[in-house]
Amino acid sequence: VVPILPLFDLDILHTTVSGLEKHIAAFIEHKNYTNIHLLGNSLGGHVALVYILKHPERVKSLTLTGSSGLFENAMGDSYPKRGDYEYIKNKTAQTFYDPAVATPELVDEVFEITKNRIKVIKIIALAKSAIRHNLGEELNQIQQPTLLIWGKNDIVTPPFVAEEFKKLIPNSQLHFIDKCGHAPMMEVPVEFNSILEKFLGSLSK
């Protein structure tokens, strides 16, 4: 089940990591899901961390990949620059090890978002919220088995971030994937799924 995060649908006051977590919590409550295997990438990982800290009784395992919550490089300088297609194209490509993963369709989608002033304001609000909402001092409370899958070439949440998550989350294991950036599930789906399936399989034994 992949719930859509309402990145642009919440009012500006609730366009935060906590606001997104409340949305996910309400969805899980509505569906009455328990024994959840929770997985999140980037900001989604941050939301998953806040959720598991608030509702540990509902979660069986946690998988993070390129997660914010400790450190993130945001998108650097003055992102997002509105109306500069080449800039957006380059920034989108930097998310991945292989720039070809940033297809014209994906770049067009990002570019359309950056042309919308309200959406840009909400992206900036979420980025600032993620930086403020550092979870370093709370991660030792997570007792569930945790899988960390990280691209060795991630420049948004670099490998040292994964090492820090590994150090702070007690029952965690870390797998680096070579020649991979910030989105392993998109860049190397076969390897990503293989690591994930092995982890989930070990929990059912």
Regions found by a protein language model. Give the residues of each.
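Alpha/beta-hydrolase active-site loop signature
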Residues: L5-D9, G69, G181-P184
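Active-site loop/oxyanion-hole signature of alpha/beta-hydrolase fold enzymes
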Residues: V1-L39, S194
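Conserved alpha/beta-hydrolase catalytic His-Asp/Glu region
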Residues: R82-Q143
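Short beta-strand/loop motif that positions the catalytic acidic residue
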Residues: I142, L148-W150
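Catalytic active-site module of serine/aspartate enzymes centered on a nucleophile-bearing elbow/loop
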Residues: S172-K205
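Acidic catalytic loop of the alpha/beta-hydrolase fold
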Residues: N153-T157
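Flexible "cap/lid" loop of the alpha/beta hydrolase fold
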Residues: H46-K54, R58-N90
